[in-house]
Design a protein with these regions (language model features):
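Surface-exposed extracellular loop regions of Gram-negative outer-membrane beta-barrel proteins
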Residues: 3-25, 94-97, 102
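Residue-level signature of outer-membrane beta-barrel architecture
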Residues: 11-13, 26, 46-48, 86-88, ...
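Residues that define the transmembrane beta-barrel architecture of outer-membrane proteins
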Residues: 1-5, 36-40, 54, 74-80, ...
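Outer-membrane beta-barrel "beta-signal"
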Residues: 122-123, 149-161
Length: 161
């Protein structure tokens, strides 16, 4: 059964390559026994690339989580979120984004998550965009009976009004 989704709200102040940000996220993933995971993060990143339409950034965020499993178990966790992001416009209508995130748990040594995303965006015309997005997740301490790794591929076409 695959029933998963993410809603995320981000706010950032950007100045001279520095990005100070706060975000809130809601995640649910029935296949991984997550009914709801709410998180709030505060941190910064720095883009070392000075080329327009390119990004090579490192970031650190401090994150608080509240997770509710399908069997109604509630856990609270504090995590560090270390990010490495690359973004490059290959052609006028093609952009590639690579993102890696390492999320260790402060309270439990050896408990960490890893998330890698590869996103290819192709602008078909002024209104349509094709997006091919692959996501790999690793959780060192998943719920019992849940595999440590998870992979999904999402293809979408969006229309801009």
């Amino acid at each position: 059964l695959i029933n998963k989704g993410v809603q995320e709200l981000k706010y950032s102040l950007v100045d001279k390559g520095w990005d100070l940000g706060i975000n809130t996220k809601h995640l649910y993933d029935i296949s991984r026994n997550i009914k709801n995971r709410y998180s709030t993060a505060l941190g910064f990143s720095y883009n070392i690339s000075r080329i327009k339409n390119e990004k090579l950034a490192f970031g650190v965020y401090f994150q608080k989580e509240k997770e509710l499993t399908l069997d109604e178990k509630i856990t609270f966790q504090n995590r560090l979120n270390a990010d490495f992001d690359i973004s490059k416009r290959i052609a006028e209508n093609i952009e590639i984004n690579i993102s890696n995130g390492y999320l260790p748990n402060f309270e439990k040594f050896g408990d960490f998550r890893w998330k890698s995303t590869l996103d290819l965006k192709i602008k078909l015309d002024t209104k349509f965009l094709l997006s091919i997005n692959s996501v790999f997740n690793f959780d060192s301490f998943p719920e019992e009976g849940i595999p440590e790794t998870d992979y999904h591929l999402i293809n979408s076409i969006s229309y801009t009004f």
